[in-house]
Amino acid sequence: MKFATKAIHAGVHPDPATGAIMTPIYQTSTYVQDGVGNHKGYEYSRTLNPTRHALEKNIAAIENGKHGACFGSGLAAIDCVIKMLNPGDEIISTNDLYGGSYRIFNTIFAKYGLVFPFVDMQNPA
């Protein structure tokens, strides 16, 4: 499948409830469950919803990967990746980054033994 075709169609399936060709944007926060802990794939939008699920499948297909992951913010994505590291690991970062990222690196994650050298990325030396 060519890139443009993947970008438009990967992860997209007609909505069984409405017949919509493209995945609807689901703005609900919670989903009906058949019983406690017995959901139909979605229980709370913060964990997963059909819109984000389709986007993650689409990104995985575009990147020729098995899985894709989407987050509500860049800091949420950073938090997820950083938590896979171990004390003593170093993350080389640009010195020209979002202030929230700088603060979370230095005030939260540095306490766990992670090292964050900040580099001037405009100076290749």
Give short role names for the model-derived ranges.
Residues M1-I25:
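Short conserved active-site loop signatures built around small residues
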Residues P14-P16, T23-P24, S29-V36, D120-Q122:
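Histidine- and aromatic-rich ligand-binding microenvironments
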Residues A17, A61-I62, K111:
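Residues at alpha-helix termini
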Residues Q27, A69-F71, S93-T94, F118-D120:
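General beta-strand structural signal in soluble alpha/beta enzymes
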Residues T30-D79, K83-M84, G100-T107:
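Conserved N-terminal alpha-helix of the aminotransferase class I/II PLP-enzyme fold
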Residues K66-G68, D89-E90, V115-F116:
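Short active-site oxyanion
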Residues K83-S101, V119-D120:
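Conserved PLP-anchoring active-site segment centered on the Schiff-base-forming lysine
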Residues N106-A125:
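PLP-dependent aminotransferase-class I/II
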